């Protein structure tokens, strides 16, 4: 299926780019190109001396990026956790003026049944961001134990019925001639295993999220990107990060908070504020930003988005 038919509305477009405080001649990284909404807006704010490097794991995102004919722009087919390697290869370590990350799954990925991310559309159970490498969700489910699956569902989906669902999935795969291979097939098995239904949320929501996060090592990728951001950024370089679920947002929030706190010193000790702040690597910029009611109405998928911004000292 050609995913160009799937409309993608970039979430918190202006807020995330404004958070970078773009310098016209600066060097920026869009770590999650997607369909290019943030990248195109960044390019519109750069002078001829400015530069934008984008990364993405999705081959279809790379194809979209290759349609941008602009000498200031380049795309690299890799995960955003590899940004330090990209910068090192380009001689840009410590010279980046801003990094933007828009975490999670894009609308084209969700809406294309062939990608296997959605429990609302029937398609092959894939879920890989990069379809050129790694195990698909179906391949992993065919070999996972009930205990390991329950751990994934609990850890990455905060699923209260993790053990029941895991047992149902593994039992089905052991007894059936044909193992689970379709999205709606898995969604139905999960729905049948859940004893209490939330009328506001599909019973497979948390399980699909958890399996997707595990298959793509999403939290590991984010952890690596956060830990390396300080070495990549130039002084006063900005981090602008949009997350879509509590696990991601908690990681981003804790990272920014931890790296923006000074030393704990005894009360009354004569020490200058400049000395206290000398070894604080980050400054948090403003409060967390959520989509407006108007944006949520225009794009309901933006509802859970949270934007956090920080600046390297």
UniProtKB/Swiss-Prot annotation:
Transport as UniProt keyword = no
The record's keywords, sorted A to Z, are: Cytoplasm, Methyltransferase, rRNA processing, S-adenosyl-L-methionine, Transferase
Record's superkingdom?
Answer: Bacteria
Report the record's Gene Ontology biological process terms.
Answer: rRNA base methylation
Which top EC class is named for this enzyme in its record?
A: transferase
Compartments where found? Cytoplasm
- E.C. designation(s): 2.1.1.199
Ranges annotated as spanning the membrane: none
Kindly name one Pfam family recorded for this protein.
Answer: Methyltransf_5
Chief location category: cytoplasm
Q: List the GO cellular component terms.
A: cytoplasm
Q: Which InterPro entries match?
A: RsmH (IPR002903), SAM-dep_MeTrfase_MraW_recog (IPR023397), SAM-dependent_MTases_sf (IPR029063)
What's the catalysed reaction?
cytidine(1402) in 16S rRNA + S-adenosyl-L-methionine = N(4)-methylcytidine(1402) in 16S rRNA + S-adenosyl-L-homocysteine + H(+)
Q: Which Gene3D superfamilies match?
A: Putative methyltransferase TM0872, insert domain, Vaccinia Virus protein VP39
Residues binding S-adenosyl-L-methionine:
36-38, 56, 80, 102, 109
What Gene Ontology molecular function terms does this protein carry? rRNA (cytosine-N4-)-methyltransferase activity
Function field: Specifically methylates the N4 position of cytidine in position 1402 (C1402) of 16S rRNA.
Q: Which family, according to the similarity comment?
A: Belongs to the methyltransferase superfamily. RsmH family.
Among NCBIfam families, the record links this protein to: 16S rRNA (cytosine(1402)-N(4))-methyltransferase RsmH
Q: What HAMAP family does the record tag this protein with? A: 16SrRNA_methyltr_H
What name is this protein filed under?
Answer: Ribosomal RNA small subunit methyltransferase H
- This chain's source organism reads Actinobacillus pleuropneumoniae serotype 7 (strain AP76)
